[in-house]
Amino acid sequence: MSYENRIALGNLVPTLGQFKVMDKIPQYQQCEVHNLVEAPAEVPEVLRHVVFNIERGQTLHETIDFLNMCPDFKNIDIIYANELDDGAVRSGNCNVAYEIAKSIGMNYAYGLEFIELVNPDDNKGFHGNALFSRWPIRWAKVVHMPEQYNWYNDRQKRIGGRCAILAKLDVHGREVGVASIHLENRTDGPGAVVTATLPIRREEKAQC
């Protein structure tokens, strides 16, 4: 998507609102899933999880080195990752989720959260959430949260809003459900509760 197209879509936000503009952009309805590695031969007694804010990938090489070298990450099965760029100048215009997954030997799912509108040199200006797994990802979807803050009116002008990635992993033949959620930091306590619980409640309702 060209910068001109991103700006044209952004200009619709004040009139239509974020969600109606997001409906016009196919990437918001998609969840990328890339299974890059085989499942581990041994099944651990306990799955080890960690939440990690990648901070856009502005220090991507250092982040990858840390993930590969830190002893505490050696046996991590699942990483719930926030704030990963795809095609933004500030992080080298690369696909941060793919670069991390390839470098640390994990599968990943990625969902679009924001399209950045500030820098015309961004190849895509995409910014989103990811879930990294040592186990195959059999299914994943993106759930967009109720709006708690309109980022189009911020100095970091954007299309989009906070989202969660729901996924099903194949852990040696056993299905394990996981969720990577990025909460809105520009809201109050009740707003945070809404964004934290909605994805699970919505999925439970869909399963009924």
Predicted features along the sequence, with ranges:
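Active-site catalytic loop in hydrolytic enzyme cores
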Residues: 135-176
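Surface-exposed cleft-lining segments at the edges of enzyme active sites
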Residues: 84-85, 145-157, 180-189
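Conserved beta strand-loop-helix elements of the APE1-like EEP
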Residues: 102-104, 124-140, 169-170
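N-terminal, active-site-proximal structural segment of metallo-dependent hydrolase catalytic domains
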Residues: 1-106, 110-126, 192-195
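Active-site-proximal beta-strand elements of phosphoester/diester hydrolases
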Residues: 44-56, 141-143, 166, 175-184
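His/acidic metal-ligating clusters that form di-metal
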Residues: 161-181, 189-208
